Regions:
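Pyridoxal 5′-phosphate
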Residues: 200
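Conserved nucleotide-sugar donor-binding catalytic segment
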Residues: 209-211
Length: 257
């Protein structure tokens, strides 16, 4: 009996970075998003996306139904006043993003979310759940929190789960699969005594990667992609961890006599 042929599909990833109005995704706004879609076999860039996000208001995200109570007209009017998401001065200064820039160049949040969904769908190259793109980022759990906030605010959690690789957690929430370049860098550089921090700019410098305009989402995505690509190539070279990229003997140090 002939062995059934298996088609080798193409795995992809979306390299992601946010700039935000603070560190807490439950109350702070997204201010800028950047993405690059890549093939995981060659790290060829398939597409790019970057936008500022217009200021938006805080929204209720469900929870247990509340008991109805009678309210005065004044109370109703006060509740109708929207509460803006937090845009902390320190965060805006850190990223060199102003509220005026967001008002004039920012895209409405729901439009951005729809474009993120379309971006992931467009750059999925093979059919089947295992070929949905994974996320790649530097300290990516931070970005995932803000990505989940955006999806919830736009009401597109279902579509989010349809286009990205991931699983449903104990509480029924979709958790996207991701690769953190901090972990990839540790795999490659943990034995390097000159590496004492895994901040993006320091890892990029150690690996010989040029980082332009740090703390800009688009520039950070490019550097993150290059870090992931370089770490991947080294791990594919039978354990070559030398920064100079020279071949090292396969014999492990602790086996040498």
């Amino acid at each position: 009996m002939a062995t059934p042929k298996t088609e080798q599909g193409t795995y992809t990833a979306v390299v992601l970075d946010f700039e935000t109005g603070g560190l807490d995704c439950t109350r702070c706004a997204c201010t800028q998003i950047a993405m690059q879609a890549v093939r995981l076999d060659t790290f060829e860039v398939l597409g790019r996306y970057a936008n500022y996000i217009a200021p938006y208001d805080r929204q209720p995200l469900g929870g247990a139904p509340k008991r109805k109570v009678l309210k005065t007209r004044r109370e109703i009017e006060q509740e109708s006043v929207s509460e803006t998401m937090d845009y902390e001065a320190a965060a805006l200064n850190y990223t060199d993003i102003t509220m005026e820039l967001l008002r004039t160049r920012g895209i409405p949040l729901k439009q951005v979310v729809a474009e993120v969904i379309d971006f992931a769908r467009k750059h999925t190259l093979s059919k089947g759940p295992r070929y949905k793109p994974v996320l790649i980022g530097q300290n990516i759990p931070f970005d995932v929190g803000f990505l989940q906030q955006m999806m919830a605010y736009a009401g597109l959690q279902k579509e989010f789960a349809q286009v990205f690789a991931g699983t449903t957690d104990f509480y029924g929430n979709f958790q996207p699969h991701y690769l953190d370049t901090i972990d990839l860098a540790r795999l490659c550089l943990a034995a390097d005594p000159q590496v004492t921090s895994y901040k993006l700019e320091l890892v990029a410098e150690r690996l010989g990667i040029e980082l332009d305009d740090a703390h800009d989402a688009d520039a950070d995505v490019t550097a993150t992609r290059e870090v992931a690509a370089l770490c991947s190539r080294r791990m594919r070279q039978d354990g070559d961890t030398d920064v100079s990229q020279q071949r090292t003997p396969k014999t492990r140090d602790h086996f040498k006599i």
